A protein has these predicted regions:
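Long, amphipathic alpha-helical "stalk/connector" segments that mediate intersubunit docking
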Residues: 2-7, 27, 100, 108-110
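N-terminal first-folded block
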Residues: 14-51
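Positively charged, polar, low-complexity stretches
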Residues: 25-27, 33-38, 58-86
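Gly/Ser/Thr-rich loops at beta-strand to alpha-helix junctions
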Residues: 54-57, 104
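Short, compositionally biased "basic patch" segments
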Residues: 1-17
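Short basic, glycine-rich beta-strand/loop surfaces that mediate nucleic-acid
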Residues: 71-113
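Electropositive phosphate-/nucleotide-binding environments in soluble metabolic enzymes
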Residues: 10, 30, 102
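Short connector loops at helix/strand junctions that flank enzyme active sites
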Residues: 44-45, 67-69, 91-92
Length: 113
């Protein structure tokens, strides 16, 4: 079992959403809890996982357990599931998004307060 890597809470800015949209268009994101967990088990693992502030306790626990096991930092952000869903899937609810690229992960973390 891995040790706890990182679990923090951050406030996001307008620039964060712009950078996240750019990462999505570049194909460097995976969104949705099931897809993220599947990607964590794959060879090419996410660099960073963001979870929304109003994600369910079950979703939060599942992502925390998986990210802890695979040593992937998990950051809770002040964005809602509605905001993430609108940005990433054009509507609906999205509780989490994984970043697959080091550069985008570093830049997104820099845009969080």
């Amino acid at each position: 079992m891995g040790q706890i890597v990182e679990y923090t809470s951050k406030t996001v800015t307008k620039q964060f959403f712009g950078m996240l949209g750019l990462a999505k268009r570049a194909g460097k994101t995976v969104h949705g809890t099931d897809m993220i967990c599947e990607q964590m088990r794959a060879k090419r693992k996410p660099v960073l996982v963001f979870v929304s502030q109003n994600a369910s306790d079950a979703t939060r626990k599942r992502l925390f357990t998986k990210s802890n096991f695979y040593s992937i930092p998990l950051v809770e952000i002040s964005a809602s599931t509605e905001e993430l869903g609108h940005l990433l899937s054009g509507g609906g609810l999205t509780a989490a998004v994984a970043i697959m690229d080091d550069g985008f992960a570093a830049r997104l973390l820099a845009e969080c307060k």
